[in-house]
Amino acid sequence: MLNVLSGYTTANIKSYEFKAGVQLEPGDWVVFDTDGTLIKQTGAYDMVTQGVTFPVYQNNVTAYDNRVLGRVDVVTANSGVLETDKFAAVSFTPGKALTIKDGVLALATAATESTAASPVIGFVVKYDAAKKLVQFVLN
């Protein structure tokens, strides 16, 4: 699930073609494949090798029009506050930096001697553990 809580009138929602056979649901995070179609992001997000990433707003599983047209709608910018139930099994704190891992929100990590910092895609606004919802803003 992905909701636009504020900024809906200014949100930049774009429609892109998805790779045949790929099922994308609201709240999944996608990247472009080598042929220019969208696929679900996998592994630790790497901006250099995977390029830009977007959250899916309108899917191709239950949204018949999108499935028939071969497209999904993603939020690309100016979205205000977004809310999702698709995130890693961790506790979120408002203000903390977010990244993407295996197609869902996760906490960003700082650089260490042996690893680089994870790319920051946004920040936590609110976390409701009881409802299993994270509100966030894109970077």
Task: Describe each model-derived feature in a short phrase.
Residues 1-139:
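Surface-exposed, low-hydrophobicity beta-strand/loop segments enriched in small/polar/acidic residues
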